Amino acid sequence: MIEVQNVKLGTLISVFFFGMIGGTLRYLLSLKLASTGTILVNLIGSFCLAFLTYYVIERQKLPAWLSTGLGTGMVGAFTTFSTFTVDILGLSTFTDATFYLLISVVGGFLLAYTGMILGIKLGKVGDRR
């Protein structure tokens, strides 16, 4: 049995609850958009996690249980590396797979960077008030 020390029940419940939301959102998008949905959720998730980290969490605007629930639970369940990998393997040509990989990795990095910059800038604006 895995023993976890210093984990609060509220945090576990938060990760569970927000994980259900993130997983459900990903599932609904995948029904509508197939493999395009995987790229979309991973790109959106990259932005959201960076924004959460650099604005909400770093500024400690939310209690720890809520920021963990949103980041690890919702964004973690919303994004998916395993589906990303299976989608790449299912593409018919090397060119398609390469394009998918590049859009996902480069786009994810750029959106995470954008989320970070936006979070930092909004944090500085909020500090002036």
From Swiss-Prot:
Regions crossing the membrane: 9-29, 37-57, 74-94, 100-120
Binding positions (Na(+)): G76, T79
Single Gene Ontology MF annotation: fluoride channel activity
GO cellular component, one term: plasma membrane
GO terms (BP aspect): cellular detoxification of fluoride
Reaction(s) the record says it catalyses: fluoride(in) = fluoride(out)
Regulation: Na(+) is not transported, but it plays an essential structural role and its presence is essential for fluoride channel function.
Organism superkingdom: Bacteria
Keyword annotations from UniProtKB, A to Z: Cell membrane, Ion channel, Ion transport, Membrane, Metal-binding, Sodium, Transmembrane, Transmembrane helix, Transport
Subcellular location: Cell membrane
Membrane topology: Multi-pass membrane protein
Pfam families tied to this protein: CRCB (PF02537)
Family: Belongs to the fluoride channel Fluc/FEX (TC 1.A.43) family.
Function statement: Fluoride-specific ion channel. Important for reducing fluoride concentration in the cell, thus reducing its toxicity.
Protein name, UniProt field: Fluoride-specific ion channel FluC 2
Organism: Ligilactobacillus salivarius (strain UCC118) (Lactobacillus salivarius)
Gene assigned in the entry: fluC2
